[in-house]
């Protein structure tokens, strides 16, 4: 199956290229850019030399559909909302890595993203592509809203507790830390090497745009869920996310019950790895892979459960999950082309 990538020169775009070039079923028909049309991708990123030869093309839905069936949008918020109606109109399936189609309520999108929302008729067609929890909807979708990186790690950790109803609905606290690639390709003072090296920074306190998508998804599984407390930090690594979830249980529990809950929830999910009791993962152990690793603890003194969830923000948090969703759409095993061992060193 032929695919196209729009926004091919951003970090999400080049990760898609890396994965799709090694995929046994998908092949890249075309790469598209806004600012570097006519350039060969190897001139922009020399590490692709002798691997692929593609000239970056203009974005024309009528031309793209002549060769491709699926389009990946690795574009900033606001851009996808403008492009997607044209792509859907010519019969392309769209997997969008931006936040433009994650929120069902346009008012909430505008409140958190500070920009105009996509048209409601397009929003209504979008499926939130958290693969492990939305497989059946993804399978028949024409438009996938690929989840945010923080949201992916947070939801995979939180949903088993929320669905089971065993935690106090107003007790969810999520502390999240990300490598610098999560901030995107455009440099800022905050991501400048001297500012972040040997340092860490909290940012978007109570304002991060992944909050509403987390709350929206939690509410799908438990309408009693209340607003969450969510904080995000930049740490001096290139890629990787660690989320630490805290929540208070409604009644006394045994750690074995919680361990069993997670193991049974994800027993049919090949990319979710639950650590043995008392063991906890680190981002290095999933780097370069599509895995989400989790460890669970329970504090009898406080009645709180702690879940540690780690992913590679460029893989399970972006391009990897996008291809996982494409696999589901194409009727393939969802692991196809994604069975990379983590790059520990």
UniProtKB/Swiss-Prot annotation:
<dbReference type="Pfam" id="PF22698">
    <property type="entry name" value="Semialdhyde_dhC_1"/>
</dbReference>
<keyword id="KW-0560">Oxidoreductase</keyword>
<feature type="active site">
    <location>
        <position position="149"/>
    </location>
</feature>
<dbReference type="InterPro" id="IPR050085">
    <property type="entry name" value="NAGSA_dehydrogenase"/>
</dbReference>
<dbReference type="GO" id="GO:0006526">
    <property type="term" value="P:L-arginine biosynthetic process"/>
</dbReference>
<dbReference type="InterPro" id="IPR000706">
    <property type="entry name" value="AGPR_type-1"/>
</dbReference>
<keyword id="KW-0521">NADP</keyword>
<dbReference type="GO" id="GO:0070401">
    <property type="term" value="F:NADP+ binding"/>
</dbReference>
<comment type="function">
    <text>Catalyzes the NADPH-dependent reduction of N-acetyl-5-glutamyl phosphate to yield N-acetyl-L-glutamate 5-semialdehyde.</text>
</comment>
<keyword id="KW-0055">Arginine biosynthesis</keyword>
<comment type="pathway">
    <text>Amino-acid biosynthesis; L-arginine biosynthesis; N(2)-acetyl-L-ornithine from L-glutamate: step 3/4.</text>
</comment>
<dbReference type="InterPro" id="IPR036291">
    <property type="entry name" value="NAD(P)-bd_dom_sf"/>
</dbReference>
<dbReference type="GO" id="GO:0003942">
    <property type="term" value="F:N-acetyl-gamma-glutamyl-phosphate reductase activity"/>
</dbReference>
<dbReference type="GO" id="GO:0005737">
    <property type="term" value="C:cytoplasm"/>
</dbReference>
<keyword id="KW-0963">Cytoplasm</keyword>
<dbReference type="GO" id="GO:0051287">
    <property type="term" value="F:NAD binding"/>
</dbReference>
<dbReference type="InterPro" id="IPR000534">
    <property type="entry name" value="Semialdehyde_DH_NAD-bd"/>
</dbReference>
<dbReference type="Pfam" id="PF01118">
    <property type="entry name" value="Semialdhyde_dh"/>
</dbReference>
<protein>
    <recommendedName>
        <fullName>N-acetyl-gamma-glutamyl-phosphate reductase</fullName>
        <ecNumber>1.2.1.38</ecNumber>
    </recommendedName>
</protein>
<comment type="similarity">
    <text>Belongs to the NAGSA dehydrogenase family. Type 1 subfamily.</text>
</comment>
<keyword id="KW-0028">Amino-acid biosynthesis</keyword>
